[in-house]
């Protein structure tokens, strides 16, 4: 397989499939695809009393924004909730979407929801 063929295959994948691919690559090669800590670490280091980086986060939907329908769709995808439950969660913002989530997954969830138009906080 050529590099171009691999790139074309990746272009055709959904965000969920890409996330699974990254995790599989991390496990297979013993590496981490985490972004450099310099950017995110500066904000996190200020709040850390003992200097340790937080490993588990609560993903909180702060507000749905103008594209509420898109946010509901993303919340359904991320949580596996039904339409009624996802709508109730989004309508009741601020609400916790998931608790005790690994940093990479929390950041991925935040990016997906913000891309859909919502505002998210990681606590």
From Swiss-Prot:
What SUPFAM superfamilies does this protein map onto? ClpS-like, Ribosomal protein L7/12, oligomerisation (N-terminal) domain
Q: Which UniProt keywords apply?
A: Ribonucleoprotein, Ribosomal protein
A single Gene Ontology MF term assigned here is: structural constituent of ribosome
Instruction: Tell me one GO biological process term.
Output: translation
Positions the record marks as coiled coil are none
**Cellular component, GO, one term:** cytosolic large ribosomal subunit
Q: Which family does it belong to?
A: Belongs to the bacterial ribosomal protein bL12 family.
Q: How does it assemble?
A: Homodimer. Part of the ribosomal stalk of the 50S ribosomal subunit. Forms a multimeric L10(L12)X complex, where L10 forms an elongated spine to which 2 to 4 L12 dimers bind in a sequential fashion. Binds GTP-bound translation factors.
Q: What does this protein do?
A: Forms part of the ribosomal stalk which helps the ribosome interact with GTP-bound translation factors. Is thus essential for accurate translation.
Name assigned to this protein:
Large ribosomal subunit protein bL12
Species annotation: Clostridium acetobutylicum (strain ATCC 824 / DSM 792 / JCM 1419 / IAM 19013 / LMG 5710 / NBRC 13948 / NRRL B-527 / VKM B-1787 / 2291 / W)
């Amino acid at each position: 397989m050529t590099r171009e063929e691999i790139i074309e295959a990746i272009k055709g994948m959904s965000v969920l499939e890409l996330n699974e691919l990254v995790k599989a690559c991390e496990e297979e090669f013993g590496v981490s695809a985490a972004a450099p800590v310099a950017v995110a670490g500066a904000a996190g280091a200020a709040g850390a009393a003992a200097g340790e980086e937080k490993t588990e986060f609560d993903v909180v939907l702060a507000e749905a924004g103008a594209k509420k329908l898109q946010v509901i769709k993303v919340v359904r995808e991320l949580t596996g909730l039904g339409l009624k439950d996802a709508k109730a969660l989004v309508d009741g913002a601020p609400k916790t979407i998931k608790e005790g989530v690994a940093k990479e997954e929390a950041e991925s969830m935040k990016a997906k929801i913000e891309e859909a138009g919502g505002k998210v906080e990681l606590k």
